[in-house]
Amino acid sequence: MANTSSTTSDIVVRARVLIADDEGTLLEFEAENEHCLMRGAHEVRVIASPELDALHNGPYNEIALGDYTFHFNLVAANRFGAQVMLFAKRDDIKVSGAVFRLKVWNSKKRAVAPPHHEPEPVPAEEGAVADRAEPESGDAPPSPKKQKLDEREQD
């Protein structure tokens, strides 16, 4: 269950750029203090920083660094702010240092997609006639096959 009686955040994290290259930027969010978390939801306060502005410009992937999941939301009113909920899967999870990462993809670079591989056509066996994919213009559509019935069903 979420702790709703407290007005302070469970965890405070600060964003820093871990790697920046042509493909994008890897942001790492580090906790300022060590925390021992119980199972359930915990609010994570993200300190506003210019590094978070890049998240508004392109897609990003979330990477958890422990036995928990998290949900990351951008704030429309503040391009340098974010809201995070962390969901601990079990009791007594120690959180310190790097808590989670976000991989921000470069939106200015053209979209790179994995290559689409078409299945290779199977060569026809020797002496066998290859199937035609579509009927030719003069061909009639194939007629439906008739079902054989027993003598009792025919009566």
Swiss-Prot record:
InterPro entries: Telokin-like_Tlp20_baculovir, Tlp20_sf. Residues 109-155 are annotated as: Disordered. Gene3D superfamilies: Baculovirus telokin-like protein 20 (2.70.40.20). It holds the Pfam family TLP-20. This is Telokin-like protein 20 homolog. It comes from Orgyia pseudotsugata multicapsid polyhedrosis virus (OpMNPV).
